[in-house]
């Protein structure tokens, strides 16, 4: 059976460019023990890198979701530290040529001046999909946008390609072993990878 996780309602209306509101899963060891057990794919704070699934990283103008299962960088087809990612906001259009400002942002299909839902579905083979949804009370309908799909986020340098079977297997194993949900809000002078 597929596992579906609906995350807390997201409100980024006050989160501008240069800021990153994040919800992500990490393969944290000994998560039930008190102490310095935090880890992520980048090895922050000197910790050993661990598997990470960025369910939502964003602000009112940009959004990214990324699966990171292995070390390494570059568009080499693996879900490495750069990751198997979908990003909207860095460019005017996404990889399918759709205008990002119409899909996500103030006044977009997902209007970031209002709260919205983020829902992730994890399939037994390690496929991940992430949907954004929002109720449009004026038009009395729910708007749903498929944001992330393992079928088109295979880290091939901006080309739609599927995540490899090996990385799907790693994702399934990490999820099967259990991961910890982490939230953060941070700012940087250089968030060009997102904004």
Positions of predicted regions on the chain:
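GH16 jelly-roll
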Residues: 1-195
């Amino acid at each position: 059976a597929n596992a579906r996780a609906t995350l807390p309602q997201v409100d980024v209306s006050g989160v501008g460019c240069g800021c990153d509101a994040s919800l992500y899963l990490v393969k944290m060891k000994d998560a039930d023990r008190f102490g310095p057990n935090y880890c992520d794919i980048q090895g922050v704070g000197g910790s050993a890198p661990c598997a990470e699934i960025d369910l939502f990283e964003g602000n009112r103008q940009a959004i990214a979701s990324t699966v990171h299962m292995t070390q390494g960088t570059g568009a080499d087809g693996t879900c490495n530290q750069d990751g198997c990612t979908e990003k909207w906001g860095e460019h005017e259009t996404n990889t399918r040529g759709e205008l990002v400002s119409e899909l996500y942002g103030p006044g977009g299909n997902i209007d970031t001046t209002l709260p919205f839902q983020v829902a992730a579905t994890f399939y037994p083979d390690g496929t991940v999909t992430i949907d954004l949804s929002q109720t449009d009370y004026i038009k009395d309908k729910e708007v749903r946008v498929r944001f992330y799909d393992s079928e088109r986020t295979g880290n091939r340098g901006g080309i739609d390609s599927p995540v490899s079977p090996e990385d799907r297997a790693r994702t399934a194993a990490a999820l099967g072993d259990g991961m910890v949900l982490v939230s953060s809000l941070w700012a940087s002078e250089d968030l060009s990878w997102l904004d």
